[in-house]
From Swiss-Prot:
NCBIfam families: rpsL_bact. One of its GO terms (molecular function) is structural constituent of ribosome. This is Small ribosomal subunit protein uS12m. The keyword Membrane does not apply. It comes from Brassica napus (Rape). The gene is RPS12. One of its GO terms (cellular component) is mitochondrion.
Length: 125
């Protein structure tokens, strides 16, 4: 515990906040190219095959990004737009691919939450 005089002389050092999405370079989104598309199993209580892509961003960072939604058309060398946002049950996956932009198609026929999956408005009957 510092004395009052020590605090006057030196003050307290502020804690530095760490950036969770350092690969984005303070940008809201970044463009990248797929190096590999694969599946990964989640952490302990959950069970699935989550679709992920290894992406090289335009600033030369290599990251893993989650591909949301059912089905996708990504393959090697596809261009994708990446945003921040981790996947809680996949360690090391701290980014999401944005559907409906560049080479990653939106989900056809989706009616709810369309904006999150790049789906077009359905034709009214």
């Amino acid at each position: 515990m510092p004395t009052f005089n020590q605090l006057i002389r030196h003050g307290r050092e502020e804690k530095r906040r760490t950036d969770r999405t350092r690969a984005l370079d303070k940008c809201p989104q970044k463009l990248g190219a797929c190096l590999r598309v694969s599946t990964r199993t989640p952490k302990k209580p959950n069970s699935a095959l989550r679709k992920i892509a290894k992406v090289r961003l335009s600033n030369r960072h290599d990251i893993f990004a989650y591909i949301p939604g059912e089905g996708h058309n990504l393959q090697e060398h596809s261009q994708v737009l990446i945003r921040g946002g981790r996947v809680k049950d996949l360690p090391g996956v701290k980014f999401h691919c944005i559907r409906g932009v560049k080479d990653l198609m939106g989900i056809p026929g989706r009616r709810r939450g369309r904006s999150k999956y790049g789906a077009e408005k359905p034709k009214s009957i």
